[in-house]
Amino acid sequence: MRLVLDSGNSSIKYGLFINRELFGSGIIKKNKSICSILDPDILSKINIIASCKVTEELPIKDLPKVKHIQINNNSIFPFNVDYKTPQTLGIDRIVACSANYKKGESSLVIDCGTCVTYDYISKSGNYQGGAISPGIKSRFQSMNNFTEQLPFIDRYKKNPQKIGDSTVDCM
């Protein structure tokens, strides 16, 4: 079983894979250990950990000794990275593109986290860059800070209405 970790700015997303099939997934807070949320039987079956991290700390120090693959900007990816400043390109963005890349197809990868990122890979297999914009929490803070009447929303609905019928639902 493989444990795949994406350690972002605010939280850590994880996926458990058996062969190439997703077995389970979730999100944990940065200060929690993966061992505190997974069943000991599942933990004992993990033999490879693959991770990319934006921050330094990973929640795996309590795990048994298993092979750990740290993905970074020097890793080999299935496409060419055609980016002016590759040393500044977030590894989380490249990993998200790798997970979605299909040879011979162009793709736009949108990842919603602390920031919302948009990344484009051409049909010929060239990562060409993208855009970074504020995430949901930053957007809510901005709407409240820079308008007179929009309220601050600190919790948002996971499945909002398609068309809002109140100010909060519209936001």
Residue ranges of each PLM-predicted region?
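A charged helix-plus-loop insertion that forms the helical arch/lid used to bind
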Residues: 88, 130-131
